[in-house]
Every structure is written in structure tokens, then in C-alpha cells.
């Protein structure tokens, strides 16, 4: 019987560990099941198909038309005789574009769209690294808040139960008792709010990964966090050249410029080479009798645009404004990136100091808790004071963990700007987690 219970406990513990997810589980799951990633991947494939469609415009267009007819002559007046007969014909047409100046501009535009889609895909995969960490950090903070809420609720329950005993013995009034009751009931509501917030974060993870999170790890608050230092000017200079969003914006400028050039080129003539081969076979019965005919033609088609109601001129003007907007967006993005880098560096420096302060605060509260715990063993402190000390310790611990997670998240963002962000970064954070 004892062995059976032991095995059951081991199975429960192992099951809990198997179902618990870490940051890498969230990230790997997102690579396979994140819907936004699937859409961006399909967009990248679509851009390749658009490029193939554009490049195919330079190749000849070949078509075959076949026709068969059976003619029934009901009445005929004229020389000779004519009976029912049939006609079979086929025509092979080849059209080879020779001069279309806009083709190369359209091809350059399609090529830039392919490059942009690849950059967007790689950028989104990097964003998945940061988003995985951010969602997991939110889970940790929400779960820690629920745990602290439970301790606070226990403390309020002890105070309320003590107040009821004091009221029964006539030491406090019903007004004071109601205060303890209201505090307890309010704490119950606060705890339920924390539980609801935890569930909402779980749903965010479900949307992100398509998987329910049953259990998670926590951050080892005693571990030393490696603190990086960033130079703002160096980071800004590097980001303005190598950041994926900057590269994508530069390609937007190229795309709009090629579109404008293509629209301008459509004012010019186009030249096509046309060749046809015709075959017809008419059975006997027609006025001219049975006959077979083969013929071929070859020629050039020149299309000179003269008047289109101002349509093409308007398209050129439209594309010119798009080109200007693309350059404006690029300039605005550069300004935004500069601001974001400076904000992140300032937050990074602030959070480094805050983590040190929170760690000192935790050490002080932990020392107070140990003192009260030891004093409670010899009757110096009540159960209420022990619970309050436990709650204060948990709050201090949660504050330290939250500040540390905020620091790690800002550090990931700064690594993205420096193009040093990789999966190894969240693997390092993963090793800081404990059960």
C-alpha cells in the first residue's frame, strides 16, 4: 500500500513536470502554430509567384485554336452544285514582345517585393523570440501575483477570525468587526481579479501558440543577472544600417520608384512580333470541292499610345506621391528607431539600478521574515504577524522578479537593434528558470 502511494506521487510529480512549459516550449510552438507567422510565410510565397508572373511577360505567348464545322445545305442557287460538307481548321499563333520599356521596371519592382517579404519574414521570426519571452514573463508575474494574493487572503482570514473571537468576548464593537469582514471580502475580490488576469495572459499565450499552458516555471530570484552596457551612438549607427525594418523601408522606396518609372514608360510605344500558321481542311460537297489549305503570316505590331483620357498621366502622378511618401516614411522610421533606442537604453540603465534596489529591499524583508519566524517559535509573534511578514516577503520577491524580467526584456529589444538577437538569448534566460 505504501509503495502504491509512493508510485502515485511520483507519477503526479512527473506529469506536472511534463505539462509545464518553459520559454523555449512557447517559442518552438509559435514557429509551428502561430497564425501571423503562417500568413507572413504565405505572403513571402505570394511575392515569389508575383515575380514569376512578371518575368513571364517577356516570353512568347503561344496559343492554338482548333475548329470543326459541319454545314448542311438546305437550298442552293448558283453555278455548280453544292452538297453537305464539313470544315476543320486549326491556327497556331505566337506573339513575342520585342519592346516594352516598362517590363524591366516592373521586374525590378517584383524583385524588391520578394526581398522585402523575406526580410519581413526574418524580422517576424526575431519578434517571435521577444514576444515569447514577453508572454512568458507576463505569465510569471501574473502567477506570482496570484500566489501573493492567496497569502494576503490567508492573512485577512486570520485577522477576521481573530476579530470574531474578540467581538464574541466583547473586546471590539460590531463596527470594528465589519471593517475586518469588509477587508477580507475585498481581498477575496482582489484575488479573483488576479486569477482572471492570469487566465487572460494564458489566453494570450494560447492565441500566440495554439496551446494551453498548464504550468510554468519561475525566475530564480537569487541568480546573478549578467548586466550588459550599450553605447547609444554606436547602437543607433548600426541600427540605421542593419535593422530589418530599415531595410524593408528602403525597399519600399525602391518599389515606389520602380512603379513610377514603369508608369512613365507606359507612355512609350510597344512592339510585338506576331506569327501565325493556319490549316484548314474542307471535305467534298462544297462549291469548290474538297480542299486543304495551309498558310502562315509574320508581322510586327506597333502600339503607340496617343490619348488615354489622362489616365496614364494620373498614374504617374499617383506613383510620384507614393514615392515621396515612401521616403517620408523612411525618414520617420529612422527618427522613431533613434527615439526607441534612446528610450530602451535609458530604461535599461534605470532597471539595472532598480534591480539592485529591489534586491536590497528583498534581503531586508527576508531578514525581517526570518527574525519574526524565529521569534514566533518562542511565542514573541502572533500568527497574524507571521502571515503579514510572509506576505511582505512574497511582495518583495515578486517586485524583484518583475524588475529583473523587465530588464531582461529591454535587453532583448536592444539586442534586436544591434542585430545580435538570436535563439541563444532566450535559451540563456531559460536556464535562469526554476520549478
Label every PLM stretch briefly.
Residues 65-96, 220-229, 261, 274-308, ...:
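Small/polar, glycine/serine/threonine/aspartate-rich low-complexity segments that form flexible
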Residues 21, 25, 121, 127-238, ...:
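Periplasmic alpha-helical coiled-coil/stalk elements that build and connect Gram-negative outer-membrane
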Residues 5-15:
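Sec-dependent N-terminal signal peptides
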Residues 28-38, 45-60, 92-109, 119-126, ...:
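A glycine-/polar-enriched beta->alpha junction
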Residues 39-54, 124, 128-149, 158, ...:
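Amphipathic alpha-helical coiled-coil segments
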Residues 235-280:
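Acidic, glycine-rich loop-and-beta core segments that form the ion-binding/anion-interacting portion
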Residues 22, 29, 36, 99, ...:
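Surface positions of alpha-helical coiled-coils, especially the charged/polar e/g heptad sites
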Residues 19-63, 98, 173, 212-254, ...:
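Bacterial Sec-pathway N-terminal export signals of envelope proteins
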